[in-house]
Amino acid sequence: MIWHVQNENFILDSTRIFMKAFHLLLFDGSFIFPECILIFGLILLLIIDSTSDQKDIPWLYFISSTSLVMSITTLLFRWREEPMISFSGNFQTNNFNEIFQFLILLCSTLCIPLSVEYIECTEMALTEFLLFVLTATLGGMFLCGANDLITIFVAPECFSLCSYLLSGYTKKDVRSNEATTKYLLMGGTSSSILVHGFSWLYGSSGGEIELQEIVNGLINTQMYNSPGISIALIFITVGIGFKLSPAPSHQWTPDVYEGSPTPVVAFLSVTSKVAASASATRIFDIPFYFSSNEWHLLLEILAILSMILGNLIAITQTSMKRMLAYSSIGQIGYVIIGIIVGDSNDGYASMITYMLFYISMNLGTFACIVLFGLRTGTDNIRDYAGLYTKDPFLALSLALCLLSLGGLPPLAGFFGKLYLFWCGWQAGLYLLVLIGLLTSVLSIYYYLKIIKLLMTGRNQEITPHVRNYRRSPLRSKNSIELSMIVCVIASTIPGISMNPIIAIAQDTLF
């Protein structure tokens, strides 16, 4: 009799949970329509993989790319709509979140063409690769719209788990296995630190988990200036620091960049930073509103260390991917300037503008590295010597992307840094801006050193890799080259007429 009553209670509870979930999905599902498109694309990939013996590669790429493009289109149609909070406060839709979601989708859309020829040449499993990329994209999108501590913790874990699997995708490569192990261990540690910081925030606010409710809870409990909030700030900064990879939380970055497949590195180098920047901005600006001086100081220290160490160590690197790893550490230092400035002096607008340019510059550089690696089997910087004599198109494309990363006029990177540093100067961050300018000059040095190697015509400096280089025609149907052309154009032309981009970025207040 007791078992019968318990069974009935279990059925009733399960029915209530199911009905509540159905109600949320029915009435709030439209707010996550771009994410639903990606979920539908994932289901289609799984169906094709499980029902078809002969994998139809073009269809798999078509479904993945189409779902990403449709998600972007949906976001564009929703632009300028009223901010909405859905799923019982777990998810927020506004212009600020949507522009970061757009950047993540753009990264994934450009990264998939980069992986086509690479996967075919290395004979890696295709369906799983695309599933991991789309799932990581989905996690990044949910992180951008997350409005409570639980979602902010779960969404990056979805992204991180796929990142671990992607970084170790070439199982036979010892470097890839080593990179995955370090990435997994440090990722697990950082997640533990992050959730510990959340627990302090949760307790100090009287048991609130929504970001805005945490602020109200801190006011009600009079704990907004307590030591507990300072402890929470330190732990959360360390946890988020792993995702952003500023110094000194950068130890995993060079090894993961060097050991992972190059298209995976291209994907992780931009999407993780975009998603983490969106999350960091909301966490620091809303729950830690009363501790702005403290988190400003913490981020200033991280920015200074990142800009100096990242660019100094990059000079000594011999691997192109490790050099870009340390370069990305320096680049995140520039982005942190925009986070510190905030909305008062267009800090977020300058950060978003620079991130848009950084995506094109970085992915363009990695597209060139993927092409060169497939044709020569190396990523050593010395082996690029004399590439211009064999493939002028690839050499010029790589040179333009590197110069744009360095911030030389009139390329997009120059105008992005100019806007970012100007906003920092207006906000009174004179030391950060001066260090940013000096380290930008330093970065130009090691970028120019590579370009000098590309353009050399001395036979004694040209390595066997370039002598045996197989040049492809300019009008090739290679998807990597098409993606590279798009990124190179986006790294050069938009900087000259960036007023519309700035206007859109300025319309992202939350």
UniProtKB/Swiss-Prot annotation:
Supply the EC number(s): 7.1.1.-
GO MF assignments: NADH dehydrogenase (ubiquinone) activity; quinone binding
- Which example biological process does GO assign this protein? ATP synthesis coupled electron transport
Sorted alphabetically, the Gene Ontology cellular component annotations on this record are:
chloroplast thylakoid membrane
Quote the subcellular location field of this record.
Plastid, Chloroplast thylakoid membrane
Q: Give TM segment ranges.
A: 28-48, 57-77, 99-119, 124-144, 149-169, 183-203, 227-247, 295-315, 323-343, 354-374, 395-415, 418-438, 484-504
Q: How does it sit in the membrane?
A: Multi-pass membrane protein
Catalyses which reaction(s): a plastoquinone + NADH + (n+1) H(+)(in) = a plastoquinol + NAD(+) + n H(+)(out); a plastoquinone + NADPH + (n+1) H(+)(in) = a plastoquinol + NADP(+) + n H(+)(out)
What keywords does the record list, in alphabetical order? Chloroplast, Membrane, NAD, NADP, Plastid, Plastoquinone, Quinone, Thylakoid, Translocase, Transmembrane, Transmembrane helix, Transport
InterPro entries (alphabetical): NADH-Q_OxRdtase_suN/2 (IPR010096), ND/Mrp_TM (IPR001750), Ndh2_N (IPR045693)
Q: What is its main location?
A: plastid
Q: Which domain of life is it from?
A: Eukaryota
Keyword Transferase among record annotations: no
Task: Give the protein's function.
Answer: NDH shuttles electrons from NAD(P)H:plastoquinone, via FMN and iron-sulfur (Fe-S) centers, to quinones in the photosynthetic chain and possibly in a chloroplast respiratory chain. The immediate electron acceptor for the enzyme in this species is believed to be plastoquinone. Couples the redox reaction to proton translocation, and thus conserves the redox energy in a proton gradient.
Family per UniProt?
A: Belongs to the complex I subunit 2 family.
Spell out the subunit comment. Answer: NDH is composed of at least 16 different subunits, 5 of which are encoded in the nucleus.
Q: Which NCBIfam families match?
A: NDH_I_N, PRK02504.1
Protein name as catalogued? NAD(P)H-quinone oxidoreductase subunit 2, chloroplastic
Q: Which species?
A: Silene latifolia (White campion)
Origin organism lineage = Eukaryota, Viridiplantae, Streptophyta, Embryophyta, Tracheophyta
